[in-house]
Amino acid sequence: MEIILIKPVRKLGKIGDILKVADGFGRNYLLPQKLAIRATEPNKELIVKQKHEFEAKDKQIREEVEKINALIKDQKLVFIRQTSDDGKLFGSVTNKEIADKLSENVSYNISHSNIILDKQIKSTGIYTVEIRLHAELNAIVMVIVARSESEAQDYLREQKTETSEDLAESA
C-alpha cells in the first residue's frame, strides 16, 4: 500500500513523505490514527499544496510539547506498594498509573500510550521510563517503587551517591 504521511511517525518518516508500507500496517494503524492518507493522484497534489500547513501545525504542536517536555524532564515519581519479603510487588506499576501520577505532577493530561516501558515494573527499585510526547521528542522520568516513604528516600540518597561517584570518576 502506498501512503502519504500527514504527521511525523517515528522510524517511518516525516510529513509529506510518500512510502510503501504493508497493507495491514497502513489499513489498521496509519489510516485510522490519521497519521497518513492513501497515495492517490488527487491526494498527492493536495499534499503538495497543504504540506506547509501540515508542517506549520506540527511545528506549533512541537513547541507545546517542548514546554511540557521541560516540565516532565527530571521528574521523580514515587509509588509506595505492598510487596513480598523478597521485594516483588503484588501486581505491577502500569503505564496508566505512571501517566496519571505524571499528569497530576505537571498539570497536563498525559496519555498512557505515551509511556514506554521496556518491561513491566514488578519489584521495588529505581526505573527509568521513557515518555514519548512527539515522534521526535522523548523525556526520561525516574520511577521509584518502594515499600515505604523512608525506603523511597533511601533509594534517592543511593541514586545521588552513585551519580556523584560517577562524576568523580569521569573527572
From Swiss-Prot:
A cellular component term from Gene Ontology for this protein is:
ribonucleoprotein complex
Give GO terms for biological process.
Answer: translation
The GO molecular function terms of this record are:
rRNA binding; structural constituent of ribosome
Matching InterPro entries: Ribosomal_bL9, Ribosomal_bL9/RNase_H1_N, Ribosomal_bL9_bac/chp, Ribosomal_bL9_C, Ribosomal_bL9_C_sf, Ribosomal_bL9_N, Ribosomal_bL9_N_sf
Instruction: Give each disulfide bond as a residue pair.
Output: none
Where are the coiled-coil regions? none
Pfam families, sorted: Ribosomal_L9_C (PF03948), Ribosomal_L9_N (PF01281)
Say yes or no: keyword Iron present. Answer: no
Alphabetic keyword roster? Ribonucleoprotein, Ribosomal protein, RNA-binding, rRNA-binding
This protein's superkingdom? Bacteria
Family according to the record: Belongs to the bacterial ribosomal protein bL9 family.
| Described function | Binds to the 23S rRNA.
Report what the protein is called: Large ribosomal subunit protein bL9
- Species of the source: Rickettsia massiliae (strain Mtu5)
Upper lineage is: Bacteria, Pseudomonadati, Pseudomonadota, Alphaproteobacteria, Rickettsiales
Corresponding gene? rplI
